[in-house]
Amino acid sequence: MLNPLSYIDALQVRDVSFKSVRNALKNHDLPVSTGWQQTVAKIIPELKKKDTKDACAASLVLIHNEMTLYCDKVVKIYEVDAGLINLLIGAMSKGFVDKGSVYTKGFPFPLALDELLKAPLDIICAAQWDEKDRSNFMMCSKQYITEREELPGDSLDDDATKDFGVFDELIGIRRRPIQLYDVVSLLPDEGLIEIRLDGVKKFNADDISRRMRRIEQLVSQFAAKNIGTPDILGTKLNFYPAIKKLYDTNDGVVGELGHVTDAAGIYREKMRHKSRDVRLDPYHHGGTVAVVDLNAYSISKHWPSPAGNGEPEISIPAHFSIASDKNPVIDILHVLNCTSQEDYDFVLDKVL
């Protein structure tokens, strides 16, 4: 029988936010501590007690799955006819999962490093996870990240020191692969298809855009071939109008705001403490009194989790130049710090 702690280990290996995992554990009334191993040590007794072990094991699996689906994602949403979504779900259930892939074999657990190094770069569908109102197709791939590490100046051997001299400090640069867990989520009742991408805090916008385009291509080509609908992702939601909605609505905390003025001023305001709201800052408030219209181009806002612990966040990122567009479009969201589907749906409702 699989050890339920393997699901927590998998989240740690994937470098999922420990803070978010800890909040999820609290929301399931499980014990926590100050780090991964200390927390595991506190959970082990719960898995040994006759009256708590089954509920604890089920909670660990659910936490893993919901964190994989919803924690720290780049999100793009498409309006699609509900009938077409149902047709697509039927077709994808039969033929979209790549059952022969190296990612599929041990899913949902990440590959060992030696396996990951040999794995192909392209994105494949490794599994289908169905929830009550949506079908999730789990997309796996690998991507390399570049890390810089400071090394002691005496790390060079004698020959290298002779060739290059003595250094006070050395910088080592290393590329390593990480396994990504992206999601294509089909919600027929809502008439929506969502693509949620992993790695929002690890990769730049260009890297993420390339991966988004590849998944869009895979879904569109599959839909064209299997249900005769070539442009199924043709209608993307525009989140630019939601910036004003988020700013004007009194709930939550606006932690960051980017805006421009009629006098060509460009401002990016950020509060030092997460509990402080940009809108209540005296400097910001004085500025809004002085300008006719606050022309915002980006915003980050968070709320207390409906589950009790955590602060799920929506960020609408954009360059200031979009504020001068005649018909501005932002089709990307960052949905951060969610510990569950409840958190994710709660914050997404704020922009839809």
Predicted regions and their residues:
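Intrinsically disordered, low-complexity, charge-rich terminal extensions
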Residues: 1-352
